[in-house]
Structures are given as C-alpha cells and as structure tokens.
Amino acid sequence: VSEPAFWAGFDRSSAQGFYDYFCQLTQHEPRRASMFGLPHYTWLCINPKESEDLGLADEVLAIIPEFMGSPNVVGIGEIGLNKNSRNEMTVLEKHVDLAGSNDQLILVHTPHLEDKRKGTRLILDVLKSDSRIRPERCIIDHVEEHTVGMVLDDGFWAGMTLYPETKCTANRAIDILEVYGNERIWMNSACDWGISVPLAVPQAAQEMKRRGNDAQYIDKVVYQNPIEFMSQSPRFIRPLGL
C-alpha cells in the first residue's frame, strides 16, 4: 500500500490537524496494514487543495521534518497544483525545496481542470529549475493523453490514475501505453472521495490481456515499473522473489 498525504474531504483548520494526520500515516496505518500482511508506505505534504493559506502551509511544512525519519516514509507528496494559483505555486516550490534538501522521492498531483496541460507544464518547470531534483526520482501522477508526452519527454515518471468517470479509464490508459510505450509509466487506483474502483489496476491488466499483450508486458506495467520507481527509496523493501 502506497498512501500519499491527501485531502480529508474538507479543509483542515490547523497545523495540529495535520500533525495528527501525519501520526496516523506513520504510526497507526502501518500497524493496521500489517494485520493483513500488507507493507504500508506513505508520503508527506500539505495537499494542493489546502495550499491557499500560506500561513497554515508554512506551519505544516515546519512539522513535516519531524516525521521524515519514520520507517514507512518514502517521499514528499502528493504535491502539485489544484487551481494553478500563485499561492499554490509558492507552496509547491517550498515542498520541492524540502524534498531536495532531504533527498526525497517526489509524488506530484496534476490538476483536474481544463488547464491540466498548463498546470503540468508549470509543475515540470518548477522541478527542472532545482538542480537537486532528478526527474527519474519524481512521478507525475494523473497524466492523460495531452500531458503524458511532456512528462516522459522531460525524463520524469508518469502515473495514470484509473477512475471509471474522471482522470483516466482503463481503456484510455492502455491506448496511451500503445502510443508511448511502457517505460517509466505505471497505473494506480484509489479509494477516493468520488466514484472510484480500488481494483481498477487488475481489471486493466485483464483488459490488456484481452487486447493481446503478453504476461511479461503486463507485469512490467502493473508491477515491475512501480517496484523500480519505489526501490529508489532506501526504505522501500522489495517483495520477496523479485
């Protein structure tokens, strides 16, 4: 399980709320996952949806280092943009500085708006402007047909988030793979606030098989690629047999 710091379904009102949330991500969720034999990894940040209040964002950013030593923390994320606002850009830059200062992997959220392309370009420019940030250690999530090319061309990893109605459906994701190949790209799913299907990735694998893709190709996209990216964190433990 890879669980990024996320929006709570409402905007939190204080840094203490985030402190408690980070305790949940680094202490309670790993224990809960272990009851079912699952390793649990997490990412830390203040989500772009809550980045308009710069004062609150600075308070949250100040407490993140306290949790970065937790054994299940693999990086900073999911950072990025929601409305492409000036304040969101400021908080994004501060997150990138935090990641660069601590040699952390980066997980990026791209906006779900008509200006996703603009937001993705802004994010890539911020990442590339910091010489400490290596593209191969960053995954740009929620790519779609009009943004995946720029992400891969700049050397970053691309994540396709599979949803039944928004973001990217399984069939669209497979079409993208047929155009752009299966290097530095993966699929993911979620249990989200909106309509979502946690089993979307294995369902997509079945559709890939139906289209004639062989087992090795499918395994690379849905399993080996995520393992390759996550293994860049010294805290990620490769599954046995790989």
Which sequence ranges carry the predicted segments?
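Short, acidic/turn-prone active-site loops that include or flank metal/cofactor-
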Residues: 2-6, 162-167, 191-192
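Mid-to-C-terminal alpha-helical segments outside catalytic/metal-binding sites
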Residues: 202-242
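Short active-site-adjacent structural elements
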Residues: 167, 194-198, 230-231
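Conserved, mostly hydrophobic/aromatic
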Residues: 42, 78, 99, 158, ...
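Short acidic/histidine-rich active-site segments
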Residues: 180-199, 218
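Mid-domain alpha/beta scaffold segments of enzyme catalytic cores
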Residues: 1-106, 110, 114, 118-122, ...
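Short helix-capping segments at alpha-helix termini
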Residues: 34-36, 129-134, 180-181, 210-216
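Catalytic pocket-lining loop regions of alpha/beta-barrel enzymes
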Residues: 93-178, 186
